[in-house]
Each structure stands twice: as C-alpha cells, then as structure tokens.
C-alpha cells in the first residue's frame, strides 16, 4: 500500500472525534464561549459574573446526580491527579484500601503509599481487562476504586461493600461520571474531571461529598496534619461554598462544563445520558462480537464500559495501522492506551458522541481492514 486509502464519505462518521479524554466538544459549547465569554473572560474570579458560572456548575451537577441531602459539590484546580494527593492528605485518616485493575486505578493507590502521614494501603488487584470485587477491611477508613478504568474500558458499579460502615467510599469517576449509572448515595466521595463525559478541558476536579466525608475533612484539619494549601480540602470546601476556587480557574473550562451540564439536564438528565452511552456501546460491542477479526477486550459483558470501549484485533490485522488510516481520514484518537501494549483500538463513547457516529466508525474500520488485505 503506497498511499493512504480514502474512506468513502458515506462510511465516515459525521464527527470523527472518539478520544477518551480530552473528548469531543459539541459545537454549541464552543459557540457559548463566544456568546457569554465577554462577560466573564478577563474579569475577577472573586466577583459575581464568574461566581455565577461556578454556581451554575454546582447547582447543575446537584440536579444531574439527584444529590442527596447534605451532600456538597466541591471543586478545585489541578484535575483528578491533584485530587488524589488532596484525598491522601485530607480524607484518609490512617489507612486505605484500593481496588486496582489498570493504570489510573493504580495511581491513587500509589499516591496513598507515598504519602508520609498515613500507613501503607491495602491493594486488591485484578488484571487489566477484568474487575476486582469490592471488599472491605476493618483496618481501613477509606475504600477507593475507579467507576470506569479509562485505560482498559472496565466499569465497576458503585456500591458499599459489606463491613465498610466505618470507611469512606471514594469513587474515581473521572471518565464515568455523567455517562454511567450511579446512585451517589452509595459513595461518600464521587470525584471526576470535566474532559470526559462533560466535554470540557481538563485542569479542574469536582467531588460530590457526603456529610460523612465533609466531617472527615474537618476532623483531619483539626488534627493539625500539615497539607499544602493547594491540596487542602478544607480550603476547597470553604471556597466552593462561596462559588469560587482557591486559585484562579480556567474560565473556558468552567463555561464549557456549565454548557454541557445544562445540555445533559435539558435532554433528560443522567437517565438520558446513560441510555445514550448504552446505545453507543451496544453498537460497538455487537459489531465486535460479530466480527471475524475483532473482539471485545473485556470478556465479561457485565464489566464492559458504556463510555470507553476497547476492541482487540486478530494478530493478522495491525490495529495501529488501522488507527493511522482512520486518523488520516479525520477519524481521530482511536489508538489504545499507550502503556497497555495491546493490538487494539480504544473508542470514547461519551454522551456528546452520537451513537450513529459509532455505527459509522465500525463501518469505516471494516472498510479499512478490507483494504489492508
């Protein structure tokens, strides 16, 4: 093959963005930056115009997740990566337990292990592509896992393990929040970032925190434990209650996030969003199961993610070459997670992505593979 094949136009998706974060941003979100941006860009984040945007985000998320009484929407700068450190400083009293099954679920466990103020965590691991069973241990005061392991496309439902009454349940929902079913009351901390289901830029973390979690934040503060101000959950809680962040936020991120939340709520809320991602994912997995050369990487259908699909290819087909040809035709970011090292494609199926585009993607893949023979 001397030149890049040109995929027929009738096989291409209308929008070729299938990244797992940063993810597709709707055109209407970008237009909203133009329409409302002049009233907030270049203005103080301590004044009403910007605080109104933060208030919209907080109230919109409370509606989207049907936030139980006493729960608070807390936010801060730095993304999920910063929140892991903030949680190690401000949520773990003595010792934590972590379920790990991939790159991102392992990161919080690593942060907890390296924090000098708490004990070494208990780590319950499963191989990439599979899911550990949520468990408890009487020695721990926080149990954490990823609602959706972005690197592998494995989803683990949110629940309270037996015997966990004295532990906070902290769920990393970075790529799952807004696209997977959840009852937030089953967690004490449900935290995420805007660049996945919420179709915004990164650099912000959001945590839905229960009264029990808020009490833990205050308890650890009162203990005198040293914490960098940037990672201080008491400071984040206080600022969030005033509809602001500790330090200057990226306003474009907040505006994109606010618009996406309004869009999701306007369409029917979390039920609508999860039915849309279920539609998209069923199209991808059914195609793979019927394919002669592709198969879902996650073998247990109960743990196949609705928002991140990983598809293994027969060794005779070079998935990297397929992704390269797709990219040359405007269908982008289908490459697998770099450290997983598998012959596969990874497909984002967040709410902004049209299920019809997922179907078109499978047609494009079939056509590309037919040209490689």
Swiss-Prot record:
SUPFAM superfamilies: PLP-dependent transferases (SSF53383)
Residues that hold L-glutamate according to the record: 46
Catalytic activity: O-phospho-L-serine + 2-oxoglutarate = 3-phosphooxypyruvate + L-glutamate; 4-(phosphooxy)-L-threonine + 2-oxoglutarate = (R)-3-hydroxy-2-oxo-4-phosphooxybutanoate + L-glutamate
This protein's record includes keyword ATP-binding: no
An example Gene Ontology molecular-function term: L-serine-pyruvate transaminase activity
GO terms (BP aspect): glycine biosynthetic process, by transamination of glyoxylate; L-serine biosynthetic process; pyridoxine biosynthetic process
Keywords of this entry: Amino-acid biosynthesis, Aminotransferase, Cytoplasm, Pyridoxal phosphate, Pyridoxine biosynthesis, Serine biosynthesis, Transferase
EC number: 2.6.1.52
Cofactor(s), names only, from the UniProt record: pyridoxal 5'-phosphate
GO cellular component term, pick one: cytoplasm
Keyword Membrane: no
Co-factor: note: Binds 1 pyridoxal phosphate per subunit.
Domain of life of the native organism: Bacteria
Subcellular location as annotated: Cytoplasm
Main localization, broad class: cytoplasm
Residues engaged in binding pyridoxal 5'-phosphate: 104, 150, 172, 195, 247-248
Listed InterPro entries: Aminotrans_V_dom, Pser_aminoTfrase, Pser_aminoTfrase_mycobac, PyrdxlP-dep_Trfase, PyrdxlP-dep_Trfase_major, PyrdxlP-dep_Trfase_small
Assembly information from the UniProt record: Homodimer.
Physiological role: Catalyzes the reversible conversion of 3-phosphohydroxypyruvate to phosphoserine and of 3-hydroxy-2-oxo-4-phosphonooxybutanoate to phosphohydroxythreonine.
Family label: Belongs to the class-V pyridoxal-phosphate-dependent aminotransferase family. SerC subfamily.
Protein name, per record: Phosphoserine aminotransferase
Species lineage: Bacteria, Bacillati, Actinomycetota, Actinomycetes, Mycobacteriales
């Amino acid at each position: 093959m001397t030149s890049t094949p040109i995929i027929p136009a009738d096989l291409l998706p209308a929008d070729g963005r299938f990244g797992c974060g940063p993810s597709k941003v709707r055109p209407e979100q970008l237009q909203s930056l133009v329409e409302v941006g002049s009233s907030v860009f270049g203005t103080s984040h301590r004044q009403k115009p910007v605080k109104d945007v933060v208030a919209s985000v907080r109230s919109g998320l409370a509606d989207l997740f049907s936030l139980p009484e006493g729960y608070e929407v807390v936010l801060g700068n730095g993304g999920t990566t910063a929140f892991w450190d903030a949680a190690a400083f401000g949520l773990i009293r003595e010792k934590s337990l972590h379920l790990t099954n991939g790159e991102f679920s392992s990161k919080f466990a690593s942060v907890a292990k390296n924090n000098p103020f708490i004990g070494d965590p208990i780590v319950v691991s499963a191989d990439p592509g599979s899911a550990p069973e949520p468990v408890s241990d009487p020695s721990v005061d926080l149990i954490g896992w990823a609602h959706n392991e972005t690197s592998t496309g494995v989803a683990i439902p949110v629940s309270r393990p037996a015997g966990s009454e004295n532990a906070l349940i902290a769920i990393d929902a970075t790529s799952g929040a807004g696209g997977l079913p959840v009852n937030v009351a089953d967690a004490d901390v449900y935290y995420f970032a805007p660049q996945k289901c919420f179709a915004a830029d990164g650099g912000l973390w959001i945590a839905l925190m229960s009264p029990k979690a808020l009490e833990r934040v205050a308890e650890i503060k009162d203990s005198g434990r040293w914490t960098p101000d940037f990672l201080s959950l008491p400071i984040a809680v206080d600022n969030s209650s005033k509809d602001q962040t500790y330090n200057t936020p990226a306003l474009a991120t907040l505006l994109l996030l606010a618009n996406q939340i309004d869009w999701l709520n306007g369409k029917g809320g979390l039920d609508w969003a999860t039915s849309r991602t279920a539609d998209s994912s069923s199209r991808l997995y059914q195609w793979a199961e019927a394919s002669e050369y592709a198969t879902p990487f996650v073998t247990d259908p109960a743990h196949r993610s609705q928002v991140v699909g990983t598809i293994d290819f027969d060794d005779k087909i070079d998935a990297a070459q397929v992704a390269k040809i797709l990219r040359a035709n405007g269908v982008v970011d289908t490459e697998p997670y770099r450290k997983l090292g598998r012959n596969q494609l990874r497909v984002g199926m967040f709410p902004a992505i049209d299920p019809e585009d997922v179907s078109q993607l499978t047609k494009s893949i079939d056509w590309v593979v037919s040209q490689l023979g």
